Structure formats: C-alpha cells, structure tokens
C-alpha cells in the first residue's frame, strides 16, 4: 500500500538495440531506479524545469517506497535511429529555449546516451516479453538503421527558420542532415537550402572527444567559461 505523500520507485531496465537484450555494466543505463508513481497529498506541486523533470513532485521523492517485484522495461534504445534524432531535437530545443546556456554544458548533458564504453548486455528472460508477443503486441519488432522520422522534420524546420550556424556548437552533427533534407523533399517537404556542416575543426574534434571519452573538451573557451560560472554559483549560493 502506498501511503499519502509517498512516491514509488522501481527498477528501470534499459533494453538496448534488441527487444531481448538489456544493459548490464557500469553505465547510468544499468542497475538504475526511477520514480514512476506517487500518491497525491493535495499539497505537492510540480516545480520542474522545461526539460527532464521528475515524474513525481520533488518534495515527495524523499518519501520513497521501493518496489522490486515489478520492473519497468525501457524501450528508448530499441529504435536507435529515432533515438538519435530525438537527442538532436532535444538539443535544438535547449538552444532555442536557453540561448545563453553554455553549449559545452548542453553537449555534456546529452552525451551519456551515446556511452557504449565497456558495454555489457544481458539476455532478457523469455517470460518478460514472449507472452506479450503471443498476444499480438509487437515488442519484438526490429527497426532499420536508416530512415526518416518526424523529429528530423522538426530539426530541419529549425534550420530553415534560424539557420544552421545557430546550432554549430551543439553536438547534433553525428547525423547527416543534408541526407535527411533530401529524404524530406521526397516526402513533400520544401526545404530548399542545402545543409553544410557549419562546425569548425576545433568543434568537430570537441564533439568526437566528448562522444568517445564522455569528457569536456579542456581546450575549449566555453569549458573555462562554464568553470567560472559554476565557481561563481558556488560562491553566491
């Protein structure tokens, strides 16, 4: 029984690329828990940021009830192509909503979704997915590694509205956006301007360094600006 003012957390099983494999390693995607439910006390309110807010009012998460006999399977990483487009669109949103936010910090926030260092995968037990497949629910569906989705359209709309240079420092250029533009045209969209990667050599190296090592690029000016900002934040808190 969940008492009034309590929040429920459950194990969060991150499936990876296939419906019957999940992460089991030292990454944030392994052996994690999330809050999935709460019992309202009629006083708690959501005071979350625009992005990445909690599923429960923050004030209730201190009253945690851990449930381990139920586990939540997370399908985010089954359709990796769509997942990569989603991460790009989120970073576009960040750049639009917080134009003064440090781009090195934005990139670092989203880099962990690409972290496959020393990746370990375990087989999901049949009982967790076969009964659903037998009921006609296609949780075993496989997805192509190429293609086009609605999030690509939204990114291209932002390019068309604001220009690509606005987004030159955020880590979204692991996707070939000119190829996406050509696919969009075939679907009837009118994106007329060719898209050329606007990044400098330093920015390209920075993005590669971040993706490979999950570390800030120590040679970038924005990194030192971020350090100063964090220091000042600590001093004045």
What kind of region is each of these model predictions?
Residues 1-232:
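Catalytic-site signature of metal-activated, phosphate-bearing donor transferases
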Residues 236-237:
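N-proximal low-complexity "stem/linker" segments adjacent to membrane-targeting elements
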């Amino acid at each position: 029984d969940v008492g009034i003012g309590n929040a429920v957390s459950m194990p969060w099983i991150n499936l990876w690329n296939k419906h019957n494999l999940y992460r089991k390693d030292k990454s944030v995607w392994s052996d994690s828990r999330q809050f999935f439910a709460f019992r309202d006390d009629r006083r708690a309110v959501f005071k979350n940021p625009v992005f990445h807010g909690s599923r429960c009012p923050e004030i209730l998460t201190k009253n945690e009830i851990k449930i381990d006999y139920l586990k939540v399977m997370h399908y985010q990483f089954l359709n990796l192509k769509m997942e990569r487009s989603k991460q790009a669109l989120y970073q576009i949103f960040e750049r639009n909503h917080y134009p003064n936010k440090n781009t090195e910090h934005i990139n670092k926030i989203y880099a962990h979704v690409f972290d496959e260092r020393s990746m370990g995968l375990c087989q999901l037990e049949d009982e967790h997915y076969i009964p659903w497949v037998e009921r006609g629910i296609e949780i075993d569906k496989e997805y192509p590694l190429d293609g086009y989705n609605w999030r690509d359209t939204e990114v291209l709309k932002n390019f068309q509205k604001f220009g690509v240079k606005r987004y030159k420092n955020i880590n979204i250029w692991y996707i070939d956006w000119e190829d996406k533009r050509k696919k969009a045209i075939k679907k009837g969209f009118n994106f007329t301007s060719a898209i050329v990667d606007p990044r400098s050599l330093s920015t390209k190296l920075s993005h590669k360094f971040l993706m490979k090592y999950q570390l800030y690029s120590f040679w970038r000016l924005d990194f030192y600006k971020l350090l100063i900002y964090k220091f000042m934040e600590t001093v004045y808190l």
